[in-house]
């Protein structure tokens, strides 16, 4: 199922009073989630629950296009508003479900949604999906969908030095030869200049450092 609608005006994210805890939505708030509080203003809880059920069915792999039309007709919602709400709810749940329950606690989830000015009763409904009885099924579907993509099964590399000779100069030009074997049996071979290889090393080291810093901050939050 896909819902497409023009992006609503972005809302400024309220200051995070829990500065030592990283938002499950990431460092940059997705625009479709930022638009939700304004769009939810006049929406009754019964309609939101129908919309939420529809989004959950979509996350479980069901075709919900016909259900979207029924909801729009029954709730008398403009197509643009409904599409934006579905997109925002889908992104919000998808981001929350990608984290294991041990990393995202119910209180943290609820507090962060309240800071986005999402109504309290709707926060409760969203939390019931992320931490309720449907979670195992949603995790199972996500794993099956992720299994479609091949992953790296083996990685090898070596340094190769090409010797260039001429009447004027003789230079050694090192490069890194890489060989990737994927889980689907395919193999990739490519050559990387040493300068690019050093950039890759730096980028990987930076990501690992940031991941370690995030883990430490979340551990401090859990200890508090």
Swiss-Prot record:
Q: Does the keyword Metal-binding apply?
A: no
Q: Where in the cell is it found?
A: Nucleus; Cytoplasm
The residue ranges of the COMM domain are 151-215
Keywords attached to this Swiss-Prot or TrEMBL record, sorted alphabetically, are: Acetylation, Cytoplasm, Nucleus, Transcription, Transcription regulation, Ubl conjugation pathway
| Family per record | Belongs to the COMM domain-containing protein 5 family.
State whether it acts alone or in a complex, and with which partners, per the record.
Component of the commander complex consisting of the CCC subcomplex and the retriever subcomplex. Component of the CCC (COMMD/CCDC22/CCDC93) subcomplex consisting of COMMD1, COMMD2, COMMD3, COMMD4, COMMD5, COMMD6, COMMD7, COMMD8, COMMD9, COMMD10, CCDC22 and CCDC93; within the complex forms a heterodimer with COMMD10. Interacts (via COMM domain) with COMMD1 (via COMM domain). Interacts with RELA, RELB, NFKB1/p105. Interacts with CCDC22, CCDC93, SCNN1B, CUL2, CUL3, CUL4A, CUL4B, CUL7.
What is the documented function of this protein?
A: Scaffold protein in the commander complex that is essential for endosomal recycling of transmembrane cargos; the commander complex is composed of the CCC subcomplex and the retriever subcomplex. May modulate activity of cullin-RING E3 ubiquitin ligase (CRL) complexes. Negatively regulates cell proliferation. Negatively regulates cell cycle G2/M phase transition probably by transactivating p21/CDKN1A through the p53/TP53-independent signaling pathway. Involved in kidney proximal tubule morphogenesis. Down-regulates activation of NF-kappa-B.
What name does the UniProt record give this protein? COMM domain-containing protein 5
């Amino acid at each position: 199922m896909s819902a497409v609608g023009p992006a609503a005006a972005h809302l400024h994210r309220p200051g995070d009073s829990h500065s030592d805890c990283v938002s499950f939505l990431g460092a940059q708030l997705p625009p479709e989630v930022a638009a939700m509080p304004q769009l939810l203003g006049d929406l009754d809880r019964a309609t939101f629950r129908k919309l939420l059920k529809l989004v959950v069915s979509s996350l479980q792999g069901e075709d919900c296009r016909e259900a979207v039309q029924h909801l729009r007709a029954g709730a008398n919602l403009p197509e643009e508003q409904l599409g934006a709400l579905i997109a925002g709810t889908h992104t919000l749940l998808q981001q929350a479900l990608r984290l294991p329950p041990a990393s995202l606690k119910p209180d943290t989830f609820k507090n962060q949604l309240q800071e986005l000015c999402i109504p309290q009763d709707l926060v409760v409904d969203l939390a019931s999906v992320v931490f309720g009885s449907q979670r195992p099924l949603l995790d199972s579907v996500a794993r099956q969908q992720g299994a479609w993509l091949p992953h790296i099964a083996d990685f090898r590399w070596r340094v190769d030095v090409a010797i260039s000779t001429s009447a004027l100069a003789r230079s050694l030009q090192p490069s890194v030869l890489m060989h990737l074997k994927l889980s689907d049996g395919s193999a990739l071979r490519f050559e990387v200049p040493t300068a690019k290889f050093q950039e890759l090393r730096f980028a990987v080291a930076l990501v690992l450092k940031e991941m370690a810093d995030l883990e430490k901050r979340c551990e401090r939050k859990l200890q508090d």
